């Protein structure tokens, strides 16, 4: 057995072992409901027995956020900025019903939005591909990663109802009249009632989006496609196209060529058609609305939101946050509270840990940690692919709804733990 094998083969069931030392802290963001239950089990079964790691813990449960007036979320984001890597459990974004359920002081904002606003960066969603699990788009053999520019556009737009006939104008007033001219743009002459909307974006945000996208393409060694409708929105979408091209030519072209990958702009309608026809294996950089829609299409096309990871990457590539792309699995949590059996898919939550640890290992130049993260992913996938052990959602995706076809939440994690020990032991 190699030195790496001896270092990796550590479990609470063994009398003697040497854990892998994680050089720098990792920020752990705990969450809500069923995912919180799973999160704790993953940490105790699959992480802490193998790693000597300083976890900077932040409880982002909705009760904790309410008790701290959401300061805990801001503190967690600042900690990620300080240490470089955060690993996040799924959290509740309260609506009116949740405010009443938890007796909250107010309807707190999405923790993900708060963290993203503090860190900046781009959210990328990547499917976890298991050949055994049927895909609604059978041709998709390799992951399709969706990068969503979650800033501005329709999501920060000002919209209004037009009550009747009149003229609509768009007015720009420069803060410093010596640097730019005021502009008044005629939008439409209404003959009757209607609707109107004005939206925006910034060069700074688009440029950051470009850097995050190019860096991920280099890291993953995948082709990158920016998709817009610049033939219609010649200035608005054209600005995205121009900034991406400028950033690519100035800073990334030579590296792309060295790796044998390429960058290309394509019209969104053409790209979506090509995506369906393709075998996968590329990154799509999309504007806010397009990214919102396409990420869910890709998730369903690959089989399940339970097999989708989400990472936040900053433009400088030095700050990274990983989490599962799904929610807190409330329905299963209600069953858990009643003491009933649950069969909750923990794969995306396991991958939140593995992707964060992999990034920590890369930043700290710790090959053993990177190796462990990869083995953890392999063990998780092989539990399903080779051992045929899966949770109910995956069994149903395979067309089998018999009780014997799936295991409980706890049994699946036990199976992954067993497979992890087996794969570590097999390292020569």
Swiss-Prot record:
Its cofactor is Mg(2+); Mn(2+). Mitochondrial IDP1 may regulate flux through the tricarboxylic acid cycle and respiration. Its probably critical function is the production of NADPH. Gene3D superfamilies: Isopropylmalate Dehydrogenase (3.40.718.10). Binds 1 Mg(2+) or Mn(2+) ion per subunit. This is Isocitrate dehydrogenase [NADP], mitochondrial. It comes from the Eukaryota. SUPFAM superfamilies: Isocitrate/Isopropylmalate dehydrogenase-like. It is found in: Mitochondrion. Its EC number is 1.1.1.42. Mn(2+) binds at residues 269, 292. GO terms for molecular function: isocitrate dehydrogenase (NADP+) activity; magnesium ion binding; NAD binding.
